[in-house]
Amino acid sequence: KITSMNFRLYSLFLLSLIALFSISCNNSRRIVTHANPDKKPTNIILMIGDGMSTPQITASMISNEKRTSFERFPYSGLVKTHSKSNKITDSAAGGTAIATGHKTNNGMIGMNADSIAVPSILELLSDKGKKTGILVTCRVNHATPAAFISKNINRNNYYEIANDIANTEKLDLLMGGGRKYFIDRNDGKNLIDTMISKGWTYYDTI
């Protein structure tokens, strides 16, 4: 049986534990940064690891004997990238959330859930006269990179996405795979030739 006196003592004990925990947290090692908030960055590089979140970064920190590059960054933040249609996102909806700030349905790229095209941060920076580029280890018309430059209701429309990439005026550098979607096409177009005619310099090896 819990009496009023016992309840008060129990509550006091819990409050004491919380206070001690708060003090221990406040005395933990502080991370001091030397970032200058008034200094504007020369370049912005957005790195996206496929399926990567804080658990993967933590695992890297634990397994790596040396300090990881992530720990050298002066700032860190979190962003929700789940899709409008599912709590478990795919690369298309996740990439669109990062690129545009808009939630969309799984499978859709560069547009919101109502199928309305929305600008990406890459496109907005290009409009301000900044040089932009995409460098990937996958196909350049894959869902994640495509979310920054293409608008399509289906991430699997690789040939349509390749056409968007070839005809954009908001991209200055493109490196990655997926060459066949630019040349082996049912419409007979050679999108690599199209890009060269627009002033691109093409290399098929490094």
Predicted feature residues:
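Short, intrinsically disordered, charge-balanced linker/junction segments flanking boundaries
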Residues: 2, 203-206
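Core hydrophobic alpha-helical transmembrane segments of single-pass membrane proteins
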Residues: 15-19
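N-terminal catalytic scaffold of extracellular/periplasmic and nuclease hydrolases
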Residues: 26-185, 189-203
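C-terminal motif of bacterial Sec signal peptides marking the signal peptidase cleavage site
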Residues: 21-24
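Bacterial N-terminal signal peptides that target proteins for export
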Residues: 2-13
